[in-house]
Amino acid sequence: MTTQRKPYVRTMTPTWWQKLGFYRFYMLREGTSVPAVWFSIVLIYGVFALKGGVDSWAGFVGFLQNPLVLLINFVALLAALLHTKTWFDLAPKAANIVVNSEKMGPGPIVKTLWAVTVVASVVILAVALV
């Protein structure tokens, strides 16, 4: 015997995520993937320009000096920093580190991750500029 009752289907508007700050921030964080794709494409373009020789590399550097490209790269940098911050804030929740029978707080883990990021960035810049 089947029932004639219709199931309740809750309506969902396309802007449902705009009502709560948590969801807006989630969508912003997920949106950081778009600038990451831009950065990846520019990086691949740079590798092929480097392989192509001096003229190709000069064209790539000229492309990077375009004000619109500089603006997009700045937005990509901000997006990468936001994404990094959210992942570093998430890392202590996944790690259960116990020191002297007490669970370590998130502060030292996050600070260590940022310190490693800064040191790695400085080393990469030093190698690139020498």
From Swiss-Prot:
Can you say where in the cell this protein is located?
Cell inner membrane
Q: Which residues form a coiled coil?
A: none
- Cite a single Pfam family from the UniProt record: Fumarate_red_C
Q: Which InterPro entries match?
A: Fumarate_red_C (IPR003510), SQR/QFR_C/D (IPR034804)
Show the stretches that span the lipid bilayer.
34-54, 60-80, 109-129
Which key words are in the record?
Cell inner membrane, Cell membrane, Membrane, Transmembrane, Transmembrane helix
Gene3D superfamilies registered for this protein in UniProt = Fumarate reductase/succinate dehydrogenase, transmembrane subunit
GO CC aspect terms:
fumarate reductase complex; plasma membrane
The record's GO molecular-function terms, alphabetically, read:
succinate dehydrogenase activity
Which superkingdom?
Bacteria
In what way does this protein cross or attach to the membrane?
Multi-pass membrane protein
NCBIfam families, alphabetically? PRK04987.1 (NF003445)
Write out the function statement from the record: Two distinct, membrane-bound, FAD-containing enzymes are responsible for the catalysis of fumarate and succinate interconversion; fumarate reductase is used in anaerobic growth, and succinate dehydrogenase is used in aerobic growth. Anchors the catalytic components of the fumarate reductase complex to the cell inner membrane, binds quinones.
Q: What quaternary structure, including any partners, is listed in this protein's UniProt entry?
A: Part of an enzyme complex containing four subunits: a flavoprotein (FrdA), an iron-sulfur protein (FrdB), and two hydrophobic anchor proteins (FrdC and FrdD).
Which family, according to the similarity comment?
A: Belongs to the FrdC family.
Protein's name in the database: Fumarate reductase subunit C
